[in-house]
Amino acid sequence: MSKAIRFYETGGPEVLKLEDVEVGEPGAGQARVRHSFIALNFIDVYYRTGRYPLALPEGSGSGLGSDAVGVVEAVGPGVTDVKVGDRVGYLMGPQGAYSQVRVLPAEVLIPLPDGISDRTAATLMMKGMTAQYLFRQVYPLKGGETILYHAAAGGVGLIACQWARALGVTMIGTVSTDEKGEIAKANGCAHVIVTSRENIVQRVKEITDGKGVPVVFDSIGKDTLMDSLDCLQPRGSFVSNGTSSGSVVVDSQLLAAKGSLWMTRPAMLHYIQPRAHMLDMARELFDHVLAGRIVSEPKAVFALADAAEAHRALESRKTTGSTILVP
C-alpha cells in the first residue's frame, strides 16, 4: 500500500484527498519508484481546477503531479535504462506523483548524478528543464541580449535568473513585491520591476534606452499580455509559457500592428523527445548545478498529507522559488 493524493472533482485545494492505494509490480517497460521528494508546479493547480481537463472516472478519480525524485525499487521486463537502487527523477510522468510509491514508464526516468541531492533535484526536474528549453530551444539565447522575464522570483524564475547570468544575458524581471525583487536580484536578475508600484513598459523602455527587448517570456498570461507586446522590439518574440492569470487570446492583426511580432505557446512535451534529447537537456542543467552556476533549494516544504495547504500557499503568491512535498 502507498499513501497518495487523489481527487474526484475539480475545485479548490479542498478536493485533494489523502488515500491508501495499491501499488503493483511493474509491467514491461515500467519501473516502481519510491519517492523521496515531490515537486509542486503551477500546472498542478491547472489540473486541479479544471483549467487543463483531466479525466476523473467516477469512483476512481485521478492522481496529481508529474514531477518527483526517488529510488527505483523494481523494474519490469525489457527495462535497461535504469536498475534497482538507481536514484532518478522525472518531470513528465503520468499524473500521480503526489504519492509515496508508484509505477510508471521507465522511459521518463532521468538518472541523478552523485553530486546532486534528492532535495535539490526535486526543485530542478520540471523547473530547471523548463528554463533549459525556454532559453536553449524556444528562443536560443547567445549572450549579450536584454530580455524581459515575468515572475522572476518564482520556481522557474529563480533558476532562469541564474541561467541568464551564466549565459551573459541581461534579465529584466517582473516581481510583485520589493522582497521578491531582492531575491531575484540575488539570483542574477540585473533589473527588477515591482509591478505593484512600477509601470512595466515605461521601465523596460528606460532600461533599454527606448529600444525594447527582442523577447519576452510570459508565464502570467492575461494580466500581462499587452504590456509584454508593448515591450518588444519590431519583429520581437512573445513566448507565452504559462497563463497563471488567465488564458491568452491574440488576434494575428494585433501582432502585425505591434511590430510584426512572433508568438509561440511552447509545451514541454514537444521539447524533451526523444529520450536521448531529454537526457542531453538534463546533463546541461546538471552541469550548471555541479559547477555552482545554478543553486536551487526548496523555499517551502510540506508533508504529502498537507498538499492542499501547499496549493493554497502556491496560489496565494506568497511563496518564492520552489515548493516540495515530503511523502
Protein language model regions, located:
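NAD(P)H dinucleotide-binding glycine-rich loop of Rossmann-like/cofactor-binding domains
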Residues: 57, 66, 74, 88-153, ...
